[in-house]
């Protein structure tokens, strides 16, 4: 069967924070396609402020997900507008928001943007949470600016360069 829903790591995390009543802003880029207005409307319905969503030419980021008979998923990330987010604009947005206490990031945008935003956060005593999806090796300098790292089992294997077996977990 086919279903379409809103998502992306950053969007899902912002929506949950908004639904829980947190003062939540989404800093992102969306394309000039059919997903733009639907996504902005969804954020607004879920108590996520959209003042700092930039609209750029081209497609929005999408991620078709296939789930096999064993419940394992396969995700193809098509970055689209996500690749156009700019660290200077993101940091400027944080300054305009003011009094930011928490930043949540993820690897579906360019890592250099995460680097700069998380360095800004560390300099300004802002707590950071990083969801390393899609999984990739993370630079030690970047990790120094991460307060909470929340990988799933596959991402943990990639980050730690370890097979996640019972024996390795118990070591």
Predicted regions and their residues:
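A glycine-rich helix N-cap at a beta->alpha junction
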Residues: 42-57
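Glycine-rich phosphate/adenosyl-contacting loop at the front of the ribokinase-like
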Residues: 1-29, 34-38, 44-45
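Short gly/ser/thr-rich secondary-structure transition/capping motifs
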Residues: 47, 83-88, 128-135
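Surface-exposed amphipathic alpha-helices with a cationic face
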Residues: 18, 115-123
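Short beta->alpha connector loops
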Residues: 32-33, 108-112, 132-136
